Amino acid sequence: MEKVRSRVGWLYRRQDSQGAVQLRKRKSRLYSKEASSACPGAGLFGENTYLVLAAVGFRIFNCMMVQTSFVPDEYWQSLEVAHNMTFNYGYLTWEWTEGLRGFSYPLMFAAIYKVLYLLGKDHVWFLIWIPRLAQAVLSGIADVRLYSLVRHLENTELAKWVYFCQLCSWFTWYCATRTLTNTMEAVLSTFALYYYPLEGSSTNSSTKYLICVALAFLIRPTAVILWIPLLFYHFAKEKKKAELVVQQYLPIGILTLAASLTVDRIFFGKWTFVQWNFLKFNVLQDLGSFYGSHPWHWYITQGVPVILCTHLPFFIHGCMVTPKRYQILLVAVAWTVLTYSALSHKEFRFIYPVLPVCMVFCGFSFSNLKRWKKAAVGFLVLSNLFPALYTGLIHQRGALDIMSGIQKLCKMENSSASLFVLMPCHSIPFYSHVHCPIKMNFLECPPDLSDSDAYIDEADLFYVSPLAWLNAEFYNKTLLPTHLIMFSVLEPEIRSFLTNNNYLKSMSVFHTHLPEGRTGSHIYMYERNSK
């Protein structure tokens, strides 16, 4: 009731100048709608049920409209692992043999797979789409939490602007329904922010926000980077510091870590501290640079501008007009970007979890626009529409489209099909998108953990001289796979090998308009004619 009373008082003060008649009319409307929706127990997740259903429905639509691949981890570090956990076959990359990844996140999808198996519905379509739909539902609920956070801190009008900016973000559209640890990190960070004790918050709960932060850390240890300044700020502001540490920080940290260790003990077969291994490899030793390195300013000059896109001017404007109590959020964003900048290996998705925080500042910008507001709305929608649709429906779709050709090999009776993927490692999904134990191989690319200067992985060795590698690898025709998959750019280099061994092109799918390096515009499947 205290929250409702404060809202009533705010509306009264705002409308005193409008006369008694208008005031009585607004008061009546407040008690019939606004007060009921402000109650924590109203509808779903403390919000209007229709809003929650609409938000989830939007993300489900978003999910169905994203039919492209982004990075290998969305399959190889989640669905592929879950498939191995449930069906006892599926490829585990070197990160799993070295204990750098934990089973907590794949366990969610393994549970889905197990239910489908028990129901006799473990068809490949369900195995591909239901995990993504589950992630879409969580992202939709996170959107509602972001809206609710701002509504409780400020007002409904500002909350609508923040939510509008969140829905317009092309990069959120691109990532929010993918089975990436970064996506789950963003979801949990948004939940945590809703319960974080910001000044003026009526939804704060130290226990709930710390649980969300702890879960994010278990799923992706670098999630703690965003929360380091926020945790210190909370500690500095807290009067009962000893109680906060003893009753909140330590119990939650110990329990969640114990749960993670237990899960990993079950699936690794030994005690494995994956969070420490992950941080040691990627942060302390900076060995992620094996997969590429960028200059220190990359996130500032490319990363942030690309993921914010046309939100950037509104974000900058929002930073100038947002009340001072939100400065800690800006500090958290800046700290995250600068910390990731210190690491050699950089990717757009690494800073995706700061995007919902940035939307708060964008919302303040729109709320404070005095002129050109309608033009700004149209500009933001249209400027994000093209990249959202292009990246979601066209760019890099071949990696998924080619899987339909592989799935058909499973349907052939008495199939003795075998497959070799002659592409940069992990370019396409694996057993999680095939769901049958046909023989499949690919060019591997584990990093050198022995620190040898002469080390070269299999994929790089292949691309030094593809034709020579193939002739050496398949020196006996009995070793030849029945099918080969490759990017179009490789075909001219190995055409003689294909011809001499009776390989014929059986499938061609479009992949990208922007081929570069070892990636081609199309993906080909070749089938060997043994007659």
From Swiss-Prot:
Alpha-1,2-mannosyltransferase that catalyzes the transfer of the third mannose, via an alpha-1,2 bond, from a dolichol-phosphate-mannose (Dol-P-Man) to an alpha-D-Man-(1->6)-2-PEtn-alpha-D-Man-(1->4)-alpha-D-GlcN-(1->6)-(1-radyl,2-acyl-sn-glycero-3-phospho)-2-acyl-inositol intermediate to generate an alpha-D-Man-(1->2)-alpha-D-Man-(1->6)-2-PEtn-alpha-D-Man-(1->4)-alpha-D-GlcN-(1->6)-(1-radyl,2-acyl-sn-glycero-3-phospho)-2-acyl-inositol (also termed H6) and participates in the nineth step of the glycosylphosphatidylinositol-anchor biosynthesis. GO terms for cellular component: endoplasmic reticulum membrane. It is found in: Endoplasmic reticulum membrane. This is GPI alpha-1,2-mannosyltransferase 3. Keywords: Endoplasmic reticulum, Glycoprotein, Glycosyltransferase, GPI-anchor biosynthesis, Membrane, Transferase, Transmembrane, Transmembrane helix. Its main location: endoplasmic reticulum. It holds the Pfam family Glyco_transf_22. One of its GO terms (molecular function) is alpha-1,2-mannosyltransferase activity. Belongs to the glycosyltransferase 22 family. PIGB subfamily. Its EC number is 2.4.1.-. It comes from the Eukaryota. Signal peptide: none annotated. InterPro entries: GPI_mannosylTrfase. Glycans are attached at N84, N204, N414, N476. The keyword Glycoprotein applies. It is a multi-pass membrane protein. Pathway: Glycolipid biosynthesis; glycosylphosphatidylinositol-anchor biosynthesis. The gene is pigb. GO terms for biological process: GPI anchor biosynthetic process. The chain crosses the membrane at residues 99-119, 124-144, 174-196, 210-230, 249-269, 303-323, 328-348, 350-370, 375-395.
